[in-house]
Every structure is written in structure tokens, then in C-alpha cells.
Amino acid sequence: MRFNETLEKIKTYEAGKPIELVVREFGIEPQNIIKLASNENPYGTSPKVVDAVREIADTMYMYPDDSMFELKSALAKRFEIDQKNIIIGAGSDQVLEFCARAVLNEKSSVLMSKITFAMYEIYALQQGAKIIRSSCYRHDLEEFYDLYKKHHPDIIHICTPNNPTGDALDAEYLYSFLDNVQEPLVIVDGAYMEYAAFKDEKKRIHPQDLIKKYPNVIYLGTFSKAYGLGGMRVGYGIADQSVIGQLYKLRPPFNITTLSLKAATTALEDEGFVQYSIEQNFLQMERFVNFALQNGFEFIDSYTNFITYLLPENRKSKSLSEALLKRGVIVRDLTGYGMNALRITVGTKEQNDRFFEIFKEVLNEY
């Protein structure tokens, strides 16, 4: 059997370990496991969303509204744009895939940060494209511009706030870069934008401003993080109609379920839940910062719902993450990104209490 030879260059993406896997591997009861690896909203889902989904549960036998009118209307109102500027994906990573398939081929190249969301590379390699990386995990846009002029990439990825590091760009800094980049498709991934904008208004990217001024830019958002809908898989892209029209040619029919559409639409209506989740996140974030300072860890100032601990040479992130896992604490080891670091989702007070207690035990042993 013959497979596409481009697959030989691709590593399988490894998502954060689910609670069920830890139950099977270590025999730990689910209630004794805390998952701080996938940057889900630890406060769950808005009760209004849960009620709305229950109300339509008996319609699951019917295909969803493929026009996605209600959700697009809600997004259009939120961002003061036309519905024709919006495409909905099964998570924003599906929109990423549409972009890669629409633009790239074996003669293409893609520019991204040295350390950033792994799916950018995977989708590019699936199309046979070449990867160009900056020299630093931060988005040094002066270096990005130099690489753009040298290599003329077909897609430029800018993740702000960046995953898995948590740092974010000032909006004006990004706009000054975009002013000088007209040819490639620039993908601005704002999966954690709700958090960044709360912490520092200068970090807020307004997608309506992007599409008015930059027809070659697409902004990505998601309901998986602040809105607490990771299990429903809903994301969106906002761009000039000329871009959205091309991406629609790649969208399969009925790619978003009825329940997911209702959940996302209702989530947009409950800003109180989102605001509460974000406020609590940054209150708890202070504890992670203080813990790092007390234990001599470096960390990256985070504009998200996670923090990245940069560990000293004598402490290996792989060993620490495995030790935590055996005790029922799931965090993300960043060895695969070339970093001796742990990415830790900021949980609830109770989850964090337990994390710090167990992490102290692990640090005393390793």
C-alpha cells in the first residue's frame, strides 16, 4: 500500500493526556485526578449553555443548520462585521487546515515562531511545504520581516498570545508589521485573546480592524478556552470576503453539530460567565508566579490561562511531569518543543491547592 511521501516528515500530534488514560494506566480514581494540561476552562461551561443544549437534545437525529445562521449572526454582531466575513470550523484548527490546503503546495513555504502551536507545522507539511522558523520563541516581528523579505513565504503564522509560551504582542506592534506585508496570507491566531485583552488592553486585537485594513489577514478565535466549550469543537475565522469565499470551497457539509452550534451561540450571550472565569484565572495566576519565585524557577509572563515554568538544568521537565502523572496530576511537558519546561493550566483554587502540595513533594524527590 502506498501513502503520500510527505507523511514521512510529519510527527503525530500528541494532545494532553485525558483523565481516562491516567485511570487506566495508574489505577487512580477519577475524582483524585486533576488535569492541568490542555488549557480548558477549569470553571466548566456556562449553566445557560448546559440548559440550552439540553433543550434541543431531542433534535440530534436531524442534520444541523449548515448555514450556521444563528452563530454567524451572533459573531457578526459581536465584532461588527458581515456574516460573509466569517467561517466556522470544528475548532479553529480546522480553519487552519482550510488555510493550508487553500494556499500551500510542495513549492510553498510557511513562516512561524521557533516555538509555537504544533499544528501550524503539521498542516504545512501535509501540503509538502517548507517550514521557516524564527530564532526565538517570542514573535520578534523585525526578524519576521527580515525572513519574509528573504524567503517570501506563502503563509505567516502569528500566535498571540503564543501557545505554549503565553507571551503576547501589543496590537500596534502587530499592525506596524502587517502594514508592510501584503503578499502572503497572515494567520493571526487569537485563541487566548480574551485572557490577554483582560490583562492588558494594549494586547487586544480587533478582528474588524484587521479585515478593514488588511485583506490578506485572517483572524482565528475559538470557544474552547475562555468560553469553556473544548468538548464541542467550535472555532471561527474572520477575514475579507475574498479569503472566506476560497476557504468555503474546502469546508465539508455539516462540519459543526447542532449541539455545538447552540452551545457556542448561547455562550456568546453569557459574558458574565466568561468574565468571572478570566478574573478568577488571573487571581490564581498570582499563586503560580509566587511559587516560581519561591522555588527559583524562571517563568514566562503569561497572558493566557496557563503558565510556562522554565526549569533549571538540574530538574528535567520530563521526569517531573511523569512523577506528577503518577500522583494524578496531568501537566504538559514541553520537551517535544525543545524546552526544559512545564506548561501548567491555571486551575480552580482547589485544584491549585492540590497541585502545589503534590509538586512540592515531587520537587523534594527529584
Swiss-Prot record:
It holds the Pfam family Aminotran_1_2. Keywords: Amino-acid biosynthesis, Aminotransferase, Histidine biosynthesis, Pyridoxal phosphate, Transferase. GO terms for biological process: L-histidine biosynthetic process. CDD domains: AAT_like. Pathway: Amino-acid biosynthesis; L-histidine biosynthesis; L-histidine from 5-phospho-alpha-D-ribose 1-diphosphate: step 7/9. It catalyses: L-histidinol phosphate + 2-oxoglutarate = 3-(imidazol-4-yl)-2-oxopropyl phosphate + L-glutamate. Its EC number is 2.6.1.9. The modification N6-(pyridoxal phosphate)lysine is found at K225. The keyword Isomerase does not apply. It comes from the Bacteria. Its cofactor is pyridoxal 5'-phosphate. GO terms for molecular function: histidinol-phosphate transaminase activity; pyridoxal phosphate binding. Homodimer. Belongs to the class-II pyridoxal-phosphate-dependent aminotransferase family. Histidinol-phosphate aminotransferase subfamily. This is Histidinol-phosphate aminotransferase. It comes from Nitratiruptor sp. (strain SB155-2).
